């Protein structure tokens, strides 16, 4: 088996890992996921194979992409953010997002984004509330269920005591990439999850990753096939992530230093153990606030700042 470089673990995994630029791009970054699964070469075929692997119970034979305008605007005219949305020949909708980091109200946000696909169907006319099933698929670069080894979670609307489905209209699938491993008995979905999370760390394609879906995945991530313009954009994106990583590390170091100082002072007056704990918390909070202010001054997008802030606030 071809081994990937060791991956970073913990709450900063989403920006600490895959900063090395080698043969393959990190396609879990938003712009490059969209390129691989919507824009480049046989992206339509790659997305189809991915959906077939995730949802084998549905006979998905072909897909079409929703327009950018309909995907990123809800019926009230407010903008929303979806990486890729498509539908199959039967009218089933698939909303696919890469989730970079855990955040407050994570599931609520998934429900919020999935319902717009339903509303757009009903706006087409008629007085019926019948709509085609919608699947929200979250590819997660973090572990939402830390105490479990499961990497794939499925949810639907059902009666609580019997499990009887209330409707076939809404489904949620979450793939926790960090929990995917490349083993002899790994399922196709687990292999895909592992490849998505580790492809930018590889110098060659592992023998275990055989088949058309991996042919297309590795082709789309091959940096030698990027246009000169895309190569520049990719390098800029990686540089931005490095800058953010360094800012976070500086903030944490500064916060720890301030926290130790405050902790010692409070410890003398209120008892060393409790004083140190409170001082560290306050110092870390100050360091994070300073980092966020610096990021805004340097023009870092608010969406990325929010992700970083959420990560820093984790224990």
Question: PLM features: residue spans?
Answer:
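Elongated, amphipathic alpha-helical interaction scaffolds
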Residues: 2-315
């Amino acid at each position: 088996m071809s081994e990937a470089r060791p991956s970073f673990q913990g709450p900063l995994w989403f920006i600490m890992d895959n900063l090395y630029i080698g043969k393959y791009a990190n396609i879990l970054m938003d712009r490059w996921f969209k390129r691989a699964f919507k824009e480049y070469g046989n992206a339509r075929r790659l997305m189809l194979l991915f959906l077939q692997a995730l949802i084998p119970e549905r006979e998905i034979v072909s897909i079409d992409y929703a327009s950018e305008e309909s995907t990123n605007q809800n019926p009230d005219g407010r903008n929303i953010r979806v990486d890729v949305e498509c539908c199959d020949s039967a009218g089933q909708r698939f909303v696919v997002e890469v989730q970079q980091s855990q955040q407050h109200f994570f599931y609520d946000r998934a429900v919020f984004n999935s319902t717009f696909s339903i509303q757009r169907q009903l706006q087409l006319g008629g007085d019926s509330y019948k709509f085609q099933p919608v699947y929200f698929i979250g590819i997660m670069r973090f572990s939402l269920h830390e105490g479990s080894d499961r990497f794939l979670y499925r949810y639907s609307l059902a009666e609580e005591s019997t499990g009887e489905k209330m409707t076939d209209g809404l489904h949620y699938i979450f793939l926790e990439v960090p929990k995917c491993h490349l083993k002899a008995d790994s399922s196709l979905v687990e292999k895909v999850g592992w490849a998505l999370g580790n492809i930018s760390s590889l110098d060659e394609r592992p023998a275990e990753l055989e088949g058309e879906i991996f042919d297309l995945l590795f082709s789309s991530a091959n940096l030698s096939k990027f246009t000169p313009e895309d190569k520049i954009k990719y390098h800029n994106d990686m540089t931005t992530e490095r800058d953010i990583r360094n800012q976070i590390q500086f903030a944490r170091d500064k916060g720890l230093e301030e926290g130790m100082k405050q902790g010692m002072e409070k410890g003398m007056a209120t008892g060393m153990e409790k004083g140190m704990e409170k001082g560290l918390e306050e110092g870390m909070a100050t360091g994070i606030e300073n980092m966020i202010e610096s990021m805004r001054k340097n023009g870092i997008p608010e969406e990325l700042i929010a992700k970083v802030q959420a990560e820093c606030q984790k224990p």
